[in-house]
């Protein structure tokens, strides 16, 4: 078991690794903007969360790019999450990530934003939300009191995705 607790980056304040699962404690969220077509919130990075139908065929790159650079985000931009509800506590997520400027396999602050937006909009009543991304399955749990989300944990499996060796020659 490995445990680290301090503000690390982008809203992450703690890490616990146990039994091949990683638990990331995320920053509290107290501001969620609701619009007719989407939600906007900052979970360590700004996230536009939009619920769509037929996520599998949705053009994440084209639509994400328009939103990321469009008003009101403009040059500062926002990550853009497209979401489809699978059942009462499970959502499929595809994310267009600023900086990468393309769809990514997974985005931790993004799935955290999706779980909170789904709860805020009453698409789920559970405080343990399952999320399916191209990179695998994740889970976000939280406490909510008077629209303030605390004790937010993102968790998923610890999987080696890359191994390399290199030789430094002088």
State what each model feature region is.
Residues 1-106, 113-170:
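Active-site proximal loop and beta-alpha junction motif in alpha/beta enzyme cores
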């Amino acid at each position: 078991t490995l445990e680290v607790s301090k503000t690390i980056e982008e809203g992450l304040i703690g890490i616990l690794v146990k039994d091949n699962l990683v638990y990331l404690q995320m920053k509290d969220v107290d501001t969620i903007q609701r619009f007719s077509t989407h939600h906007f919130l900052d979970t360590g990075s700004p996230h536009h969360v939009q619920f769509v139908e037929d996520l599998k065929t949705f053009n994440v790159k084209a639509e994400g790019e328009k939103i990321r650079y469009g008003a009101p985000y403009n040059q500062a931009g926002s990550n853009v999450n497209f979401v489809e509800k699978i059942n009462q506590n499970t959502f499929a997520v595809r994310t267009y990530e600023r900086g990468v400027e393309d769809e990514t396999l997974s985005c931790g602050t993004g799935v955290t934003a999706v779980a909170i937006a789904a709860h805020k909009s009453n698409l789920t009543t559970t405080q343990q939300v399952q999320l399916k991304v191209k990179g695998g399955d994740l889970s976000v749990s939280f406490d909510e009191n008077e629209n303030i989300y605390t004790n937010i944990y993102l968790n998923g499996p610890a999987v080696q995705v890359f191994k390399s060796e290199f030789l430094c020659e002088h």
